[in-house]
Design a protein with these regions (language model features):
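Conserved phosphate- and dinucleotide-binding cores of soluble alpha/beta proteins
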Residues: 1-140
Length: 141
């Protein structure tokens, strides 16, 4: 099946995309993460399975250059460890840059003065369950 462009679609080259990012022209970016700290620090370095050095790719540019950073991730690791933490244990990609987190259990805002604030819960998830699976304090409004 052929793929066609929608009306108004455009292409942007690699160099131009980084110029937009580094120039502060991106209003919102969505990234994955290994961990997010309650102050909004982001850790999402890719680790390699073939003995090459870990790499951050363009995420560091996005974390620094976008006006808002949202994160999409599972709430815990495969072995049940929390990904929402007081302080990141992995190398940081961006400092205090995350403003919202979407997980399979809920939506959490990151506010500078409060830390993690629960915005919404996934269907069937309780606040107690969300708190039990988090590694930092979750506040409510």
């Amino acid at each position: 099946q052929l793929i066609t462009l929608a009306k108004g679609a455009s292409f942007v080259g690699h160099a131009d995309s980084f110029a937009m990012i580094r120039g502060g022209h991106i209003d919102l970016c969505v990234l994955g993460a290994f961990e997010v700290a309650e102050n909004g620090d982001l850790a999402n370095w890719a680790t390699s399975e073939n003995d090459t050095a870990p790499a951050v790719g363009g995420a560091m540019d996005l974390a620094a250059g976008a006006k808002q950073v949202w994160v999409l991730m599972e709430h815990t690791t495969k072995d049940g460890r929390p990904k929402l933490v007081e302080r990141c244990g992995y190398p940081l990609t961006g400092l205090a840059c995350v403003r919202r987190i979407y997980t399979n259990l809920g939506v959490i805002d990151v506010l500078p003065e409060k830390g993690f604030v629960v915005r919404d819960l996934a269907p069937g998830v309780t606040l107690d369950e969300l708190r039990a699976k988090s590694g930092a304090t979750l506040h409510t409004n």
